[in-house]
Regions:
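Short N-terminal or domain-adjacent regulatory/targeting segments
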Residues: 1-21
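Conserved SGNH/GDSL esterase-like catalytic core that processes O-acyl groups on lipids
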Residues: 21-23, 31-129
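Short catalytic/ligand-binding loop motif for oxyanion handling, primarily in non-cytosolic enzymes
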Residues: 31-33, 101-105, 164-170, 231-235
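Acidic carboxylate-rich catalytic motifs and surrounding loops in phosphoryl-/glycosyl-chemistry enzymes
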Residues: 60-64, 222-235
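Surface-exposed cleft-lining segments at the edges of enzyme active sites
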Residues: 116-138, 143, 194-201
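Hydrophobic, aromatic-enriched interface-forming segments
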Residues: 132-181
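Substrate-gating cap/lid alpha-helix
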Residues: 167-223
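Histidine-centered active-site loop/cap adjacent to the catalytic His
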Residues: 235-268
């Protein structure tokens, strides 16, 4: 992240100390290109204009990033540097991560080869999947540890996505296309039944929901924003990304959580 962004955030808080200072880090649900449609954070920034200051660690390259990357190696060191800076104080830390840990090429190793008579549940390599969930959980606890060490009063806001429908539609930008991220990998394993594919992804996302509930219960000042069962089938633009209306609905859930936690934010 450019140092200029940190300096601008610092100067803004010096000029307007009543603003609610917020730090964000995340995948495409926070970093989807603004020129195509406003993502969750874009929407929140607009809704809270004049009431919150934002330091955004995510950028265009964050699309496709998994939470294990965000909280390890260079990602961990960047988060540590920001949170430990005595000149920076945050009321909230918003994080979107975990989805890319279980879809795309990351999904392939979590599936078993299809065999005759196999149920959709048999298609999941549960040992590997539970190990992956543990890695996701560990990453979030690393974040909470950093928060406790350096920004003890800050709240962490998380979510667990929504239930996608595996399909053939990629994300297109001009002549470039990216994805799909689920169906091709399931097809490669011989899991070709549409209902089985959807059941597998629903199961995995429900387990992620359980993980986030547990994280919220185990750590202080964690707000788990319940986003599952929010989007209709028509509010998905592709396998992974909501439409503009979908992003707006998800942002409304975050806005409500922010207002409950920080009453000084307006009711708009």
């Amino acid at each position: 992240m450019p140092l200029g962004a940190v300096q601008r955030f610092r100067q803004k808080m010096e000029r307007f100390p009543a603003l609610v200072p917020l730090l964000t880090q995340g995948d495409s649900w926070f970093a989807f290109p603004t020129l195509l449609r406003a993502n969750i954070i874009d929407t929140l920034v607009k809704q809270n204009e004049g009431q919150a200051a934002w330091l955004r660690l995510e950028g265009l390259l964050s699309n496709g990033q998994d939470v294990r990357q965000m909280l390890s190696g260079k990602g961990y060191l960047e988060m540590q540097r920001i949170l430990s800076d005595p000149t920076l104080k945050f009321a909230g830390i918003l994080v979107s991560g975990g989805g890319n840990d279980i879809i795309g090429r990351a999904l392939l190793s979590l599936l078993n080869e299809s065999t005759e008579g196999m149920t959709w549940m048999d298609g999941i390599n549960l040992v590997r999947f539970e190990r992956r969930l543990q890695a996701i959980e560990n990453a979030y606890h690393e974040l909470a540890d950093l928060r406790d060490d350096h920004q003890a009063e800050a709240y962490i806001f998380t979510h667990a996505y929504d239930f996608p429908t595996p399909g053939n539609k990629p994300w297109r930008i001009g002549l470039m296309k990216v994805g799909p991220w689920m169906k091709p990998h399931m097809d490669r394993k011989g899991i070709t039944d549409a209902e089985s594919q959807r059941a597998i992804m629903t199961f995995m996302l429900k387990r992620l929901d359980e993980l986030m509930q547990k994280f919220e219960q185990q750590r202080d000042r964690v707000v788990y924003v319940r986003t599952q069962s929010t989007l209709t089938d028509q509010e998905w633009d592709d396998e992974m990304h909501p439409t503009s209306k979908g992003f707006q609905k998800l942002a409304a859930l975050f806005q409500a959580a922010l207002r409950r936690t920080f009453p000084k934010l307006s009711q708009r």
